[in-house]
Amino acid sequence: MPSPVLTLTKEERICSKKLIEALFAGNGSRSMTSYPIRAVFLEQKSAEGEPPVQLLVSVPKRCFKRAVKRNGVKRQIREAFRRNKHVLADAVTGSGRSVAVALIWMSADLSATHLVETKVKDLLVRIKERL
């Protein structure tokens, strides 16, 4: 079995304001929490050339006032997602569907990278089960 591609390209990041509004408007989107990360996800029809999984990462200013800390946490979350996205992508690929996922940090404390990775992986597995 070939090893999964462990990259996070521009196409896999959510930039569309319409998609962001659809994610948070509650029209078919669902959420779950694995503290300190909350995941909001939306299953949709896949367009031609669209990646199976798209990501949005948010770390609120109320959690970390300094941008350096916010950026560090975002980097941890993106890295954990990049290494584990195949869990969700394999389930969606070939079904004509795609999933948009927003990962939101909820804690005012920093966490170790391996803990963040286990939480992200747990969320991706749980999202896969709910699809």
What kind of feature is each model-predicted range?
Residues M1-L131:
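Positively charged, solvent-exposed patches that mediate nucleic-acid binding
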